[in-house]
Amino acid sequence: IMTTRVPEFWIAVVACHGPGEAHVAANRNPLRRYAVRRQAAAGTPDPTIVNPAHLGKELSAAVCARCHALIGGFHDAPDYPLHGYAFRPGQKFEDAFVRARLVDWQTNPALEAELAKNPQIIRDRYWSDGMIRVAGREYNGLLETKCFQNGEMSCLSCHKMHESDADPRSRPEWADDQLAPGMQTNTACLQCHKTFAGDAALAAHTHHPVASAASNCYNCHMPHTTFGLLKAIRSHTIDKPSVAASLATGRPNACNQCHLDKSLGWTALALNRWYGTPVPPMNADERDIAASVLWTLKGDAGQ
């Protein structure tokens, strides 16, 4: 275990809550502070400061994206060395940054110059289907996730940036991923996917023992796909195991990350048997040789 100390990673109050001068001035009055607390308890936030928890999913996620996004550039580039990012919490991400999903590199003329300077940028940072493959860019993964696109999921659905006094975990345990209490478990997904609550429903879905790693939603739908900060990091593109995707992109799938002695052919047959997933065409090596061995001997370091 490595323990480090830093004073600040440019992640102080303003980074998440915006400039606080007006907030401080307004709340010097203790009567106002009392009134604001009563209003907050009733669901009305203090208008003098930004609280990401009270923003919609896009604006809330944009606060995190300031640090956790792969960007194509920022609109205030000439002023950046002196003043930093122009982005302030509560703004749209696109107000300050050039969005950089894989499709943006392929369609946005504003990114052509950057791509011309570094033609490897797509291969180095994305899997060929658009999934982000570098650490610390979880916002890009979130953008590709149906739970975000079609639902109300945001970063704060699982993460909690301030440790609660009632949190039974130690400070290092909380700081590892900064997940809210209970969000290290299937409780995170059961916030929405309630049909899988209960041991019987879970086992019927996973086809694995309830207490096993394979019945942990994260391990199948958010497998570890990047490495950074001295650890493996989970994909934030919530997806399902797919042999077809592994064959098309070279990206390891959740099943073969656990079953290191099994081939893609074995996984394809299991997914077909359990979920009716079509078995994709594959060559003899992919059908018969352990996927972990194939990925070790060929492909690239991202595997």
Give residue ranges: language-model regions.
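Primarily the internal scaffold of c-type cytochrome electron-transfer domains
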Residues: 1-303
